[in-house]
Swiss-Prot record:
Designated name of the protein: DNA repair protein RecO
UniProt superkingdom: Bacteria
Sorted UniProt keywords: DNA damage, DNA recombination, DNA repair
Naturally occurring in which organism (per UniProt): Listeria monocytogenes serotype 4b (strain CLIP80459)
Family affiliation: Belongs to the RecO family.
Primary gene name: recO
GO biological processes: DNA recombination; double-strand break repair
Length: 255
């Protein structure tokens, strides 16, 4: 019997009343378990196997799918559950984590990062910025290491910088002419990309970012992911549609 602290990142129906639950845990990394009877509303496993739930879990099995025996909810992130926009961002965070990681490869830092991102989304901090931070932090997990601390071409650490997918990182103004595919990003956007990649989440604090800056950030991150990650996530496509609707709603309310 194994015990762990984990976050439910995916759940699927299995048979008439069971679930297959995918969790990212502090102790074991990503694992899958069968939760028997969890689809029944009165089941003792119903609450603890809800998507995004953070809890303590006890299960049998060390290889393949285990069998969940019991669980205790630590945090269910109820605000996320009740808000369609928060849900969309949190779903993407969990799907990205799921697709980027292998079974049973523990990474306590990644567990803590995911928990902090979901907690901050739940507490009402900007979900788009938090998700962008998560996307940048996930690059090394995917085996991607853009050069963000110096010019990817000449190695200079000072000057004006832009971001380039073809050069795999930032490039300084001295090298702009050497890379015609650079993104022509505003300087503050490049600074934020560097911060998101390098600094720990708890050092970044609550960042207030203008809508147009967030759009530039998303363009850069999406372009890099499309070029290098090989991931095509349904939740990301849905999230981009949600962003369009949210922007339209905000525009109507401002008018």
């Amino acid at each position: 019997m194994e015990k762990c602290e984990g976050i439910v990142i995916r759940q699927t129906s299995y048979r008439e009343s069971d679930k297959i639950v995918r969790m990212y845990t502090r102790e074991f990394g990503k694992i899958g378990v069968v939760a028997r009877g969890a689809k029944k509303t009165k089941s003792r496993l119903a609450a603890v196997t809800q998507l995004f739930t953070n809890g303590y879990f006890t299960f049998f099995g060390s290889n393949g799918l285990g069998t969940l025996q019991q669980g205790e909810v630590i945090e269910n992130f109820s605000s996320i559950q009740q808000d369609i926009f928060m849900t969309a961002y949190a779903t993407y965070v969990c799907e990205l984590l799921d697709k980027a990681t292998e079974e049973r490869q523990p990474n306590p830092y990644l567990y803590e990062l995911t928990f902090q991102i979901l907690r901050d989304i739940n507490e009402g901090y900007d979900p788009q910025i938090l998700t962008q931070i998560f996307e940048m932090k996930m690059l090394p997990v995917l085996g991607l290491y853009p050069t963000m601390d110096k010019c990817a071409i000449c190695g200079e650490t000072t000057g004006h910088f832009d971001f380039s997918t073809s050069s795999n990182g930032i490039i300084c103004h001295r090298c702009f002419e050497k890379d015609r595919y650079r993104m022509h990003l505003p300087e503050n956007v490049v600074k934020l990309l560097r911060l998101f990649f390098i600094f720990q989440l708890d050092r970044l604090g609550n960042i207030d970012v203008k809508p147009e800056t967030k759009e530039w950030l998303q363009k850069a991150i999406d372009t890099y992911y499309d070029e290098y990650s090989g991931l095509y996530l349904k939740s990301r496509k849905f999230l981009r549609e949600m962003d369009k609707w949210e922007n339209m709603l905000k525009k109507d309310s401002d008018d």
